[in-house]
UniProtKB/Swiss-Prot annotation:
One of its GO terms (biological process) is translation. One of its GO terms (molecular function) is rRNA binding. Keywords: Ribonucleoprotein, Ribosomal protein, RNA-binding, rRNA-binding, tRNA-binding. One of the primary rRNA binding proteins, it binds directly to 16S rRNA where it nucleates assembly of the head domain of the 30S subunit. Is located at the subunit interface close to the decoding center, probably blocks exit of the E-site tRNA. The keyword Ubl conjugation does not apply. Disulfide bonds: none annotated. One of its GO terms (cellular component) is small ribosomal subunit. The gene is rpsG. Part of the 30S ribosomal subunit. Contacts proteins S9 and S11. InterPro entries: Ribosomal_uS7 (IPR000235), Ribosomal_uS7_bac/org-type (IPR005717), Ribosomal_uS7_CS (IPR020606), Ribosomal_uS7_dom (IPR023798), Ribosomal_uS7_dom_sf (IPR036823). This is Small ribosomal subunit protein uS7. It comes from the Bacteria. The keyword RNA-binding applies.
Length: 156
């Protein structure tokens, strides 16, 4: 534990094209090996493709997808007297956003389309319609928390 206390949160810079901090976070999550311009090209291409397919605002589609993927509950392991219990806990807002972005990008990479731009675009559109692997991951997480509700009194 650092003696100075927690490091201060740095403000997120809004991206230049859409002016949205959420798009900046998505770009940073897609980023591999420090190639920011490549990550920007992928994300902006995916958002433009989403605009062409859905005909609406791509940032609104991304926000809707995020709302459909963000978990509100998760399970954490807690060891009590030699037994390990999966204890359901609420997810803080910052963590839920981070998890949703991680799942969106992770399941985009696992898709079968040819380019990462297409994969990300289709995963965002699927998630905004309540479909896709990222939404299924959220449902599985909530189901796990629901089935372990009996251990909620071990919460810390």
């Amino acid at each position: 534990m650092p003696r100075k206390g927690p490091a201060p949160k740095r403000p997120l810079v809004q991206d230049p094209v859409y002016g949205s901090p959420l798009v900046t976070q998505l770009i940073n999550k897609v980023l591999v090996d420090g190639k920011k311009s490549t990550a920007e090209r992928i994300v902006y291409g995916a958002l433009e493709g989403a605009r062409a397919k859905s005909g609406g605002d791509p940032v609104a589609a991304l926000k809707k997808a995020m709302d459909n993927v963000k978990p509100s509950l998760e399970v954490r392991s807690r060891r009590v007297g030699g037994a390990t219990y999966q204890v359901p806990v609420e997810v803080k807002p910052g963590r839920s956003t981070a998890l949703a972005l991680r799942w969106l990008v992770g399941y985009s990479k696992a898709r079968r389309e040819k380019t990462m731009t297409e994969r990300l675009q289709n995963e965002i559109l699927d998630a905004s319609n309540g479909l896709g692997a990222a939404v299924k991951r959220r449902e599985d997480t909530h189901k796990m928390a629901e089935s372990n509700k009996a251990f909620a009194h071990y919460r810390w």
